[in-house]
Amino acid sequence: MITMDTIRKALVCFSILSILVLACGCVNTPEKIDININSNTNNGENTEKPINQENQNVNNVENKKESQSTQNIQSYENKEIKNQENHPLQSNQNYEQTNGNFNEENENAMTNVGESEVNYNNEPAYNYYIEITYPDGTIPDKIEEQMLYYIKVIDPIVGGLAGIDIYVDGNYIGTLDDVYGIVECVFYEPGYHTITAEDNGKILASKTVYVEEGTAYNSGESENYDEYDNNYESNDLQQTQTQFSEIEVYVDDIKPSNSIIITKLAMNPGFLASINGISPDIGVNIEMENGEKINLKYVSMDVDLIIDNPNSESITIDKIILNMFDDEGHSLGRGEVSNIVITPGENPVTVKVNIPINKMGYEILRKLSGEEVFAEISGSAYIEGSGEVPFSGEADLLPPLPTPPFPLPPLPPFPTE
């Protein structure tokens, strides 16, 4: 039998159950609201990624940047090592990282302060330098003119180099040999001189030195001493200078290169007087015995020299330069020869001098008038490693001439040109 008390208890239980159901509904509702708040729509499309996916993307980006940075650093290090291996003379490069790319910046040119050595090509990575020594290997405390020195190029890592071209004041003087790695050098003038070492046109090192006036060399004894009164020149250098100083040059004879032309001119003294004012650029026309007509601007004279080499080895003369004057002091011409090998003993050498036709006409008229006509020669032989060997002498300018069939005209003045 259902009593009121039973009904009351049932209502209480139902109320409690309803409250529990409502409580459960309130707990789930905020999750839906939270999703709606984080899900904005734009034209019906979702523009925001879920929170978990966004966090994952952030982590991926950071990992990617870190990986890319590590990769770029390794790439830079590998590139730096590769550059140094492939180019030992190439200067170090500074790289600036921007978005994975590298911009190269050349380093400043290498300069060794206090040694006046500069690499003008921003190369090399090593400090090459130029060294000047005496032939015995000692380093002089000063550089003097007319002295023999050896030039070397030194690599601090491997030592002396070979095959490097050496220039002094822009003039090529030689290439470092493969045996000793040296080039002989003589400074002929005092003052500042710049030595450069080049490899295939690239300047490896440069050195500027001051060359002092040389001390006169006397009887094979050096007059250069160090602070302890010791002679610092080697015996080899003294012997070399002594040998070169003993080389002598003599004027042996002067003769026409073509004696027929001289005879032809001597037979026409009036003609010789008439050409006194003619410029040698125009010349004169002469008909030879065989009917050949030539335009004569100069008359060539051969100056025969004797060069005495008392040494046991041959010596190469770089060049011989001489000037010819007549006995009245008039300049007649200049001659030059180069690259002459002088063997031990006496060596005949001929230097040709071209005398303008109007000046030669004057000298022939003097000779026909009975005067003694001499040529005075002054010149120098330039020998590598020893400097200048001066010489002088005189000889008859003309051979005996035939008496012309015509009276001699008055002697004109010496042509100005």
Curated annotation (Swiss-Prot):
It is found in: Cell membrane. It is a multi-pass membrane protein. The chain crosses the membrane at residues 10-30, 148-168. It comes from the Archaea. Signal peptide: none annotated. The keyword ATP-binding does not apply. The keyword Glycosyltransferase does not apply. Residues 84-106 are annotated as: Disordered. This is Uncharacterized protein MJ0943. It comes from Methanocaldococcus jannaschii (strain ATCC 43067 / DSM 2661 / JAL-1 / JCM 10045 / NBRC 100440) (Methanococcus jannaschii). The lineage of its organism: Archaea, Methanobacteriati, Methanobacteriota, Methanomada group, Methanococci.
